[in-house]
């Protein structure tokens, strides 16, 4: 949390947030691990229009949302973070930068983050460990297209999987040229919101999974389906394999993981390709260098490892750990450890 001009700014609160009338909850994006149910919240909410709209569709209904001009009057500026549609970093008084989840790579219709210089940087470190290095998106798309082509030649349908909000819309856009293409309802719900918000994903008059199934369309193989990421042992995937001999392809940054503790994250699919909505290790290092802060706080994922590396190359860096009831105070930064 940040104390600023007599107000407490909670950064991506999920449960632990200040609920006084002088509090501001900043929501960097609408993934459910970055938002909260506002039933007892009396403060203001700062988020992009897209985040508020998508959160609403997912059952999180916020009132008292700050306008851009109101935020600006408080010295608060939201900047595209490149993670998902509507994702934002937060710059406070031109000095303190909170990245939220961030990606500096362009992907399909989504532009990578270009963040400003700052004095204090609070940076995510999901992949903040050496060894996490992603190939270019062009390489991943080429490999996926070659794989789909090979499977099509064998008459096998393909299920392309990613998180239903964010990754799945990128997959829809990147692989829209395959036909026929079907969209799982969980993905289609978010796709339609993207289109309402002016993003053309390129799949018009999309056919939903249930409609295709009930009308025998899935029996006419091969085909491509965009679906939420799930393992091969889920009921849905077991059904698709049993009845249609479908092949699963998951897209996740964890595909490059070599540590045994992360093997479960990418081994339960037929194929896994490294496409992430986060920065890899080198991207994170370059991001810190471009922002050139005098102090860096790392959070999430490999926060300890990334802070240690930054210290080894000359930065004043330390990790922020899990939430607890103990509050440590810095002159400008309040955070739970």
Listing of model-derived features with the role each one plays in the protein:
Residues 8-19, 68-73, 203-221, 235-239:
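Short acidic low-complexity segments
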